[in-house]
């Protein structure tokens, strides 16, 4: 009984990271089920919870409205229920990225257990090449080539890897600049996805408070108006796609879109990032 009480306390406790991961989880379910209202999702995920009392239907609508706003953390059993209906949804809420962003999580533990949960595409970049998997060793640092490879994956897995290496290199100013740039650019590309675009402001605020704030403010890549800067950069990036031939956009895969975005970002000059970088400006291409 005592252990059960402890577990309940942990489930109900939330912070800024929990709020965004739950809201993203809900959004993923919403898109996967093509549902508009919390009550619709409730009926599809928890049909057994629907009750008729005095002629009125109760369907846990309030609980799911709270999930929509990230106000409560769902129980693991409910996450499993949702996964059975919308495959991949549990990967969103339980992603390694959220643990990587929590400074209370031991870095050695992340290196031991977290990286192994990332996709093979990402792990292949992070580990030194070896004939025997049992002898795999992480690279000491991420070269420009590896940073670009991660950026062009533009996934939560790639972002998690970058955050972990950022935490590893907080004492190394030179590597922090490069990794910071890669995190910023990767997050920009990810936020172009429909399921993430509505959370772009929350994600950059979270990245600022949990990751970029680990270094001295003088060494941070973000200025005082970082939120507005990021949203403007995202708008510029989206505008470039709106100028493309609509027929090409329809036939493009996400991988192709990522490469186009990455190429565009590579051409853009940055300022005020260690006196070399700034906001993205399309007129500098």
Briefly describe each language-model feature range.
Residues 46-80:
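Recognition helix of helix-turn-helix/homeodomain-like DNA-binding domains
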Residues 131-285:
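Extended amphipathic alpha-helical coiled-coil/heptad-repeat regions
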Residues 118, 123-137:
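Short juxta-domain linker segments that transition from a proline/glycine-rich
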Residues 1-48:
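A short, Lys/Arg-rich alpha-helix, primarily the initiator
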Residues 94-122:
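Short, charged recognition helix plus adjacent turn
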Residues 74-96:
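DNA major-groove recognition helix of helix-turn-helix/homeodomain DNA-binding modules
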């Amino acid at each position: 009984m005592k252990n059960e009480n402890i577990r309940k306390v942990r489930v109900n406790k939330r912070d800024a990271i929990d709020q965004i991961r739950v809201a993203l989880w809900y959004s993923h379910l919403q898109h996967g089920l093509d549902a508009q209202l919390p009550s619709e999702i409730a009926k599809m995920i928890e049909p057994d919870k629907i009750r008729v009392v005095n002629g009125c239907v109760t369907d846990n609508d309030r609980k799911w409205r709270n999930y929509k706003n990230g106000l409560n953390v769902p129980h693991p059993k409910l996450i499993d229920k949702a996964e059975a209906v919308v495959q991949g949804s549990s990967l969103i809420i339980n992603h390694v990225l959220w643990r990587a962003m929590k400074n209370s999580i031991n870095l050695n533990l992340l290196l031991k257990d977290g990286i192994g949960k990332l996709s093979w595409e990402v792990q292949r970049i992070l580990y030194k090449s070896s004939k025997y998997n049992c002898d795999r060793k992480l690279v000491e640092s991420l070269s420009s080539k590896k940073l670009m490879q991660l950026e062009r994956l533009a996934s939560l897995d790639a972002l998690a890897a970058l955050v972990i290496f950022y935490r590893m290199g907080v004492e190394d100013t030179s590597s922090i600049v490069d990794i910071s740039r890669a995190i910023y650019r990767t997050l920009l590309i990810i936020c172009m996805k429909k399921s993430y675009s509505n959370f772009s402001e929350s994600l950059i605020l979270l990245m600022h408070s949990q990751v970029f704030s680990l270094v001295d403010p003088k060494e941070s890549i973000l200025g005082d108006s970082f939120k507005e800067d990021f949203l403007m950069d995202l708008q510029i990036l989206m505008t470039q796609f709106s100028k493309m031939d609509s027929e090409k956009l329809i036939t493009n895969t996400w991988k192709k879109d990522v490469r186009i975005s990455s190429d565009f970002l590579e051409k853009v000059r940055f300022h005020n990032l260690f006196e070399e970088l700034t906001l993205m400006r399309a007129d500098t291409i």
